[in-house]
């Protein structure tokens, strides 16, 4: 994997499929997967995204949930580690608006050189999901779920099964179309 001083990203959900699913299988100790953050689909944020219902074309007043990490002693999350440049990290920081980039080098099994980063839910992203759960309007986008499952399927049926068994959640899945908004 790259020499000392090289930055890496640990993907545990949709980032597994980025870069064609290339990277090294690894495990992040002390965490588990949850549906932990959300975006407020009522707000239109330039340069971000919104969702439309495929069946009607309408924009539902929902909070769209995404996979997050939750600290959990004795647990571990499988994923993919790949090297990234500083420019790639900056681009990921812009893209992963519901998350904060955190260093997890000492908690990763499978990479022995360089720094390893991952994205853990931001306070704001977690608060949005809490509001959506309280209002009964937190949902999962079918496309997002299928992208995550496809990423793990590319790593092998056992990896997909491990993902399915590891994610904790109870939210409904809606057929939503993602619309990227201009900046």
PLM regions: where:
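A glycine-rich, hydrophobic/aromatic-adjacent loop/helix-cap motif
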Residues: 2-183
């Amino acid at each position: 994997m790259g020499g000392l001083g090289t930055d890496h990203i640990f993907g545990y959900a949709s980032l597994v499929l980025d870069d064609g699913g290339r990277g090294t299988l690894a495990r992040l100790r002390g965490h588990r997967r949850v549906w932990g953050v959300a975006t407020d689909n009522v707000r239109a944020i330039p340069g971000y995204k919104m969702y439309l219902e495929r069946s009607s074309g309408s924009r539902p007043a929902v909070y769209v949930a995404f996979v997050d990490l939750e600290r959990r002693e004795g647990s571990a999350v499988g994923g993919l580690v790949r090297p990234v440049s500083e420019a790639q990290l900056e681009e990921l920081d812009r893209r992963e608006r519901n998350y904060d980039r955190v260093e997890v080098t000492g908690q990763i099994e499978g990479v022995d050189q360089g720094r390893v980063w991952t994205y853990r839910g931001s306070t704001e992203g977690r608060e949005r999901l809490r509001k959506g759960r309280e209002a009964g309007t937190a949902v999962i986008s079918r496309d997002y779920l299928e992208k995550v499952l496809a990423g793990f399927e590319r790593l092998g049926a056992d990896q997909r099964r491990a993902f399915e068994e590891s994610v904790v959640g109870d939210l409904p899945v809606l057929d939503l179309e993602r619309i990227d908004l201009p900046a």
